[in-house]
Amino acid sequence: MLNPAGNMLKTPFMLAAFLLVQIPAQAHHSITGEFDTAVTFELRGTLTKLDWANPHLWYYLDVVNDAGVVEQWQCTTGQNPNRLIRAGWKKEDLPIGSVIRTLRSNPARDESNTCIVGGITFDDGTPVFSGNKGETTQ
């Protein structure tokens, strides 16, 4: 036999548990929380590493700054590899050692050498990835 009082206690508890799980999930996907979308810049660097893994694609660049010093940058497209694959993008499209440019990049709020990018081209301007929706321009 069902206990109506027991069910009444379970409902608020289940609702609270659901909401507590949702808060970190929303924070994880808050681009404006991690990146300063009011600041836009471009980087030019040599690809040193590519992390083609969920939840988001990350790639690493050696970038020569204005003082001639090499800085290591880590950048993300904000997309997961499965979505990029469905859009026709392949890991092989960005070979290690390639000189690439990031387009419409936004820096990390913590002032680390981290950014999210809106597009990637090779140094000669050949587009690789455009937009943050997993679109390929090849």
For each feature predicted by the language model, list its residue ranges.
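Short aromatic-glycine-enriched beta-strand elements
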Residues: 53-64
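Short nucleic-acid-contacting surface segments enriched for D/E, G, S/T with interspersed K/R
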Residues: 85-102
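N-terminal secretory signal peptides that target proteins for export/translocation
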Residues: 1-9
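Short, structured beta-strand/loop micro-motifs enriched in basic residues and often containing a Trp
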Residues: 26, 77-86
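Bacterial N-terminal signal peptides
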Residues: 11-22
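Conserved hydrophobic positions within beta-strands
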Residues: 45-47
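Short boundary/loop segments of OB/S1/cold-shock single-stranded nucleic-acid-binding domains
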Residues: 26-41
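OB-fold/S1-family single-stranded nucleic acid-binding modules
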Residues: 107-132
